[in-house]
């Protein structure tokens, strides 16, 4: 269940959900999925330049899942993270990678300073009417903005059924959210950017309790009452063990990648 929430910018609910990760930073770092090497290959292909040596700012870096991958590719990467708990977890896990505090709506970066601006699982927390102009300000001529999200592969039956269960339990329309997240025009309602889209499928096998901890690190669960969250995760555990009796869950993701060059 990795679909981004509706970007109700300025709403109390949106702000509460955005802040909810700080208290669960260790859980997030331990159980959230990473990204496949093929995704970074696609970033290089669509931007037309190697990551090695590029000046990259990874915004909404969280605990550093994507930042570490960019660093390993040889990018000169700087993490930008607004949350206290997430930033503390990042610094604990990646002491050799620089981090500054800030967010995409007001980047703490100089004009024309960055070859590549990345948002892994984080663009939907920004207000694109502010974050698009900020991206264009800090990108160098010829630079690019890359956005990506792990999204559940909903054509796989057990994943589709899990989404339906979550929708029924919480009264949310998950399929509508997935359709909304796939609309590239919502990434930039200002119309200043021209995105190229690519999808990369990948999977991982993890213990059922790790899968449940991954689900539990999503904002819609972090902000709900503890008794309701516990009841939902217990129900999910029972259902998952019917599909995966050995207790090992195969998660499958379609990474949605959007890349736009600076006009």
Question: What are these model-predicted stretches?
Answer:
Residues 105-117:
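A short acidic, Gly/Pro-enriched loop at the edge of an enzyme's catalytic core
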Residues 130-205:
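Conserved catalytic/acceptor-binding region of the Class I
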């Amino acid at each position: 269940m990795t679909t981004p929430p509706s970007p109700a910018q300025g709403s109390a609910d949106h702000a509460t959900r955005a802040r909810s990760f700080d208290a669960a930073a260790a859980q997030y770092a331990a159980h959230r999925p990473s990204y496949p090497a093929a995704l970074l290959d696609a970033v290089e292909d669509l931007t037309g330049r190697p990551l090695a040596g590029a000046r990259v700012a990874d915004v909404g870096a969280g605990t550093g899942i994507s930042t570490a991958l960019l660093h390993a590719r040889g990018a000169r990467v700087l993490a930008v993270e607004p949350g206290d708990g997430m930033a503390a977890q990042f610094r604990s896990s990646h002491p050799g990678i620089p981090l500054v505090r800030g967010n995409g709506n007001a980047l703490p970066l100089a004009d024309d300073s960055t070859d590549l601006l990345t948002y892994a699982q984080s663009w939907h927390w920004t207000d694109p009417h502010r974050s698009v102009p900020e991206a264009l300000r800090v990108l160098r001529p010829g630079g690019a903005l890359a956005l990506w999200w792990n999204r559940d592969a909903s054509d796989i039956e057990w994943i589709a059924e899990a989404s339906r269960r979550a929708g029924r339990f919480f009264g949310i329309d998950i399929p509508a959210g997935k359709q909304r997240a796939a609309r590239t025009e919502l990434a930039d309602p200002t119309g200043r950017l021209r995105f190229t889209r690519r999808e990369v499928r990948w999977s991982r096998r993890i213990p059922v309790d790790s899968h449940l901890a991954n689900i539990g690190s999503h904002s819609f669960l972090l902000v709900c009452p503890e008794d309701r969250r516990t009841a939902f995760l217990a129900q999910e555990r029972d259902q998952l063990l019917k599909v995966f009796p050995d207790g090992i869950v195969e998660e499958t993701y379609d990474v949605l990648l959007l890349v736009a060059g600076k006009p």
